Design a protein with these regions (language model features):
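Helix-coil boundary and interhelical linker segments in multi-pass alpha-helical membrane proteins
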Residues: 1-7, 70-85, 122-128
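Alpha-helical transmembrane segments
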Residues: 2-18
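Transmembrane helix-loop junctions in multipass membrane proteins, especially transporters and channels
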Residues: 23-31, 77-81, 106
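Cytosolic, membrane-interface loops and tails of multi-pass inner-membrane proteins
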Residues: 24-52
Length: 128
């Protein structure tokens, strides 16, 4: 399997990582909260709330990234190393995005989000 395809798997686990951060950093998540974790997550504020928002955004961004990687892989017009580099850069941008969200660096977070979007578009461009 290529690095770019492995990046799809890595991207899939970024959202659950954010959920874990939200629950653990709240300091009050217990077994009873696991019966309705969405209701629990809606009560959060501060860092745990931002981690939950990063989780939601990670789920929203995942389908476009996965589709872009798969299109590039199937079409086969782009060099594999190009696809792999774009995949690693995207994962890096998502990690930076999560860090910016957790740190409440809103302006930088938006810039990093746009960089991630540009990387998704890049998969299609190099595949044309």
């Amino acid at each position: 399997m290529t690095v770019a395809l492995w990046c799809i798997l890595i991207a899939l686990f970024l959202a659950p990582l954010c959920a874990l951060i939200a629950k653990v950093s709240s300091g009050r998540f217990g077994l009873k909260d696991n019966h309705d974790p969405r209701a629990f997550l809606d009560t959060l504020s501060g860092l745990p709330r931002r981690a939950h928002a990063a989780q939601q955004n990670s789920y929203e961004a995942f389908p476009a990234f996965a589709a872009a990687v798969l299109v590039a892989d199937i079409v086969g017009n782009a060099e594999q190393v190009t696809q792999d580099v774009l995949g690693v850069m995207y994962i890096t941008s998502r990690l930076l995005y999560i860090i910016c969200y957790l740190a409440d660096w809103a302006a930088l977070r938006s810039l990093v989000w746009f960089a991630g979007l540009a990387l998704i578009v890049s998969f299609f461009v190099v595949s044309a």
